[in-house]
């Protein structure tokens, strides 16, 4: 039986005289995180099945930004291996020891990257999801050559054209992706977006999917705790989920 089935049995066993009992308040933090992880995986599988997608084609990126290593260990103990961090320095402080203790970790940079942190980012992360401007792309290309280490790269698209948000504007995506590929020799694997918080996410997910299709890009990082099932419907290959697993951040 898989993890999702085990969670369903666990929930069923908590029913007493026809009433649902909450597991989370009665169990320790490890059990809470484990149950939440499985709950998200159930939701991902359900969404994939509902829209004729293979569940194994969609990866859960557990967003661990602002959470201490002790909390992350509980997700690792529960079997999660793919994580997302916003800041290079925070990742450098937390993850070397965790990598020593747990095999198979894949670490994604999901926050904006400063060019003076490109060397550390290439050294630290397996995936950089926020390639968002020529200066950063050039710095990453130089570090890939210098370090002989090539993290997977995704271009961040600012689908809402928000002035305060990072990302290439949709109308500039063609030229930027071409620059990354043809001028810098970067292997762009896919696209990433963060829709505006005050708008419906579906048009932004659909736009990202259209741009990816135009460029033959297979990977789409979109969808967070509140809308990952919708993102799966519209083609996400990676969903970035934090609060639904770890709870609210301090």
Predicted regions: what is each one?
Residues 9-20:
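Short, Lys/Arg-enriched N-terminal segments with co-localized hydrophobic residues
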């Amino acid at each position: 039986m898989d993890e999702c089935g085990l969670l369903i049995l666990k929930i069923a066993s908590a029913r007493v005289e026809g009433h649902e009992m909450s597991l989370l308040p009665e169990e320790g933090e490890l059990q809470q995180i484990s149950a939440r992880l499985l709950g998200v995986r159930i939701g991902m599988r359900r969404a994939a099945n509902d829209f004729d997608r293979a569940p194994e084609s969609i990866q859960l990126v557990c967003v661990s930004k602002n959470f201490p290593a002790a909390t992350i260990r509980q997700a690792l103990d529960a079997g999660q291996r793919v994580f997302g961090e916003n800041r290079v320095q925070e990742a450098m402080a937390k993850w070397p020891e965790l990598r020593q203790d747990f095999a198979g970790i894949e670490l994604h940079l999901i926050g904006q990257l400063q060019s003076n942190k490109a060397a550390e980012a290439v050294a630290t992360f397996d995936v950089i999801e926020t390639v968002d401007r020529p200066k950063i792309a050039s710095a990453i290309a130089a570090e890939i050559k210098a370090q002989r280490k090539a993290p997977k790269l995704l271009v961040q698209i600012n689908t809402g054209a928000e002035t305060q948000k990072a990302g290439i504007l949709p109308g500039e995506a063609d030229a930027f992706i071409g620059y990354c590929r043809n001028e810098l020799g970067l292997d762009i694997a896919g696209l990433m977006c963060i829709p505006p918080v005050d708008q419906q996410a579906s048009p932004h997910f659909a736009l990202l999917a259209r741009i990816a299709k135009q460029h033959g890009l297979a990977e789409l990082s979109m969808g967070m705790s509140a809308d990952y099932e919708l993102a799966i419907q519209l083609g996400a290959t990676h969903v970035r989920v934090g609060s639904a697993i770890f709870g609210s951040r301090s």
